[in-house]
Amino acid sequence: MHEGMMWGRIAAGSSWYTFPDDEMTSLRDVAEHAGVSVATAWRVTHGADSVRPETRERVELAMRELLYVPATRPEATGAIGLLLPEFANPVFAALAQAMETYATRSGLATILCNTAGSALREVGYVHMLLERRVERMAFICAEVTDVRSDHAHYQQLIDRGARLVFVNGASEALEATSVGVDERAAGRIATEHLLELGHTRIGFVAGDAFALPTREKTIGRDDALRAAGIEPNGYVAHGPFTVEGGRTAMSALLDEHAADPPTGVICSNDLMAIGVLQEAVARGLRVPDELSVVGFDGIDAGGWTQPPLTTIEQPIDVIAKTAIAALSSELDDPDLALANYVFRPRLRLGGTTAAPPLRKAARRAPGRARAAPR
């Protein structure tokens, strides 16, 4: 190991993958990491047959772990790598489609990479992109959003001069462009909407507790509650960012607070909100008469529920356009290339929110109090 070199690690089961924190990895680094001579490492990188399979495997593993790319490849291509955690999530698909459209208009090809939410798979795709001299990459809701993660592989990309954009997820530890929605404002706007309707027991069906967007929405919700004179309560349940995750979290929330259930719920995304609606139906709760629900994202499927979902809509098209501009030659100014673009979401009213049951009863009370004439 070179003197003064710093190392970062990420875990995968019982394995640790190591990345140097310095500038572009040299062939000597690969040789040392694999425990072979530089000459042997050179033969592997140039496809020579005179290397034992087990030795070749060690060298190739070192190349992947160190993001090493032989310097004999062609120059950088006019393409971008677009890495997202899954294709099934409608908002990821919408972002990818919009970004591909704007990339094409900018003369850039797009290579889509499904990381399946795996840091190691993400690193594998990064290495594949670098091998093909793709030096511009956009990460949608990537591993960087996990506050527990070691972000060393992103830093290494930055050190080697790659142009990165983080979409809907960033890290304060990295000097890179980020483009996304104001998650804290989203949590605040959703909560304020329910407060204005008269709700005070406002739950949060939240995604992964270690995801930065979840933490930001939590802060926004708590800020809105405190501003209304309500101390943030324990009406919070976490689950995966899926329909089933939302339903399971809502079930846990209702079971935990059976004696005093929430009358309104905000959700980390629209998929989770749809799961909340399913759980409400299963329990015989009428939406919005007995339970109000607010989602986040503004996906088309939110308009297909009955009643249509009230949600906090993020500006997908603007986010996509800005992200591609940051990756293209339109933003060669270093100051602009490191900017953070944060866009405010907006409330989109559907039919899943209304005044809480007690407020409705109070409104009807005067009429019921009058005695009918005899």
Q: For each predicted feature, which ranges?
A:
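N-terminal helix-turn-helix/winged-helix DNA-binding helices
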Residues: Y17-M24, M63-Q97, S106, A116, ...
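Hinge/beta->alpha junction and helix N-cap segments in small-molecule ligand-binding domains
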Residues: E54, L84-A94, L112-R121, E143-V147, ...
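Flexible loop/turn connectors
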Residues: H2, W7, G13, L27, ...
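Short acidic/polar active-site loop segments enriched in Thr and Asp
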Residues: E135, T200-R201, T263
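N-terminal helix-turn-helix DNA-binding module of bacterial transcription factors
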Residues: M1-T77, P357, A362-R374
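Short beta-strand-centered segments that line the small-molecule binding cleft or hinge
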Residues: V123-V134, A138, V144-A185
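Proline-centered loop/turn at the N-terminus of a beta-strand
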Residues: A109, E135-R136, G161-V165, T177, ...
